[in-house]
């Protein structure tokens, strides 16, 4: 439960949110490209896009990290909550309760399985070693708990509460961003989409495994884990508010590369705060509020994402056309 169980629950929660309601589904325009044009219009184009993203991130990362003061917004989220407790308390209590229940379950299993091994190794240091083993157990149980809490998006309602509290007048329930997908019966799915996703997720799991191994280092490991995944933390927090701003799934993904420095900056502070057990249960809510405030103060408009729009316009536009078989 403390390891594989948390990962399984986190994965299920993420999939439910990713393919859940509140979205309109359209085929990726690439599915209409004839197979004899794939070399130029699919493979070379995607490779060129990856190289362009890499260059852009490397050239703008550090400048972007301090643009807009993204690292201050986890604190601004706390101040917003402190100023308007009555508006946020009910939703925040539900999130905190879910965190505490999950943290208790993970801690129980962790203490029954992994803590004895740490104790056996560190007991040679005497009382200090015992203290390190116990304290690290809480830190790492918090890591596994947050994997589930973040990917399950328990904080989504809080995003809507914060937007409404800050004067959003449109009916949020009517906003349905597009989710582009590749039909399983299309050439594009088998010739590019599935192999690419398979490699991507295998590499992702490998990186996650390495990061989790790092988190096993006593005391410093869990903190390093949160620092290293800081852009991913921000991606999760920004997903809901960007959906409500009508960003489709391609634009949300592109946004990570266009603002990689801001994602890392916000996630760095949010991750450090969430490294503290129990406090993390409150920080999930205040960081959520902070992510909304950042997007309100520095709005990101889908139409300005030139590369994303060019990517879609470069392909045939009749997305209702039957894909080549």
UniProtKB/Swiss-Prot annotation:
It is a multi-pass membrane protein. Residues 113-118, 230-263 are extracellular. InterPro entries: Spore_wall_assembly. Residues 1-91, 140-208, 285-325 are cytoplasmic. Signal peptide: none annotated. The chain crosses the membrane at residues 92-112, 119-139, 209-229, 264-284. Its main location: membrane. It comes from the Eukaryota. This is Outer spore wall protein LDS1. The gene is LDS1.
């Amino acid at each position: 439960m403390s390891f594989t169980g948390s990962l399984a629950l986190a994965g299920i929660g993420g999939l439910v949110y990713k393919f859940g309601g509140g979205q309109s589904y359209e085929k990726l325009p690439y599915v209409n490209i004839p197979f004899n044009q794939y070399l130029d219009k699919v493979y070379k184009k995607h490779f060129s896009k990856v190289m362009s993203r890499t260059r852009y991130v490397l050239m703008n990362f550090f400048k972007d990290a301090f643009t807009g003061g993204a690292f201050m917004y986890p604190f601004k989220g706390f101040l917003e909550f402190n100023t308007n407790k009555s508006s946020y308390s009910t939703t925040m209590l539900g999130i905190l309760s879910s965190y505490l229940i999950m943290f208790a379950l993970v801690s129980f299993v962790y203490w029954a399985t992994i803590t004895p091994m740490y104790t056996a190794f560190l007991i040679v240091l005497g009382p200090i070693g015992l203290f390190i083993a116990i304290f690290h157990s809480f830190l790492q149980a918090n890591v596994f708990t947050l994997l589930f809490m973040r990917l399950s998006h328990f904080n989504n309602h809080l995003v809507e509460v914060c937007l409404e509290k800050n004067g959003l007048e449109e009916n949020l329930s009517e906003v349905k961003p597009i989710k582009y997908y590749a039909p399983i019966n299309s050439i594009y799915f088998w010739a590019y989409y599935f192999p690419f996703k398979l490699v991507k997720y295998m590499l992702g799991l490998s990186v996650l495994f390495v990061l989790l191994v790092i988190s096993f280092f006593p005391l410093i490991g869990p903190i390093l884990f949160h620092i290293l995944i800081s852009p991913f933390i921000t991606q999760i927090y920004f997903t809901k508010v960007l959906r409500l701003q009508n960003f489709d799934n391609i634009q949300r993904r592109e946004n990570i590369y266009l603002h990689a420095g801001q994602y890392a900056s916000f996630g760095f502070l949010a991750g450090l705060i969430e490294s503290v057990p129990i406090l993390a249960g409150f920080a999930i809510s205040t960081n959520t509020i902070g992510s909304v405030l950042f997007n309100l103060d520095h709005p990101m408009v889908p139409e300005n994402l030139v590369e994303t729009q060019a990517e879609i316009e470069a392909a045939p536009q009749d997305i209702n056309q039957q894909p080549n078989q």
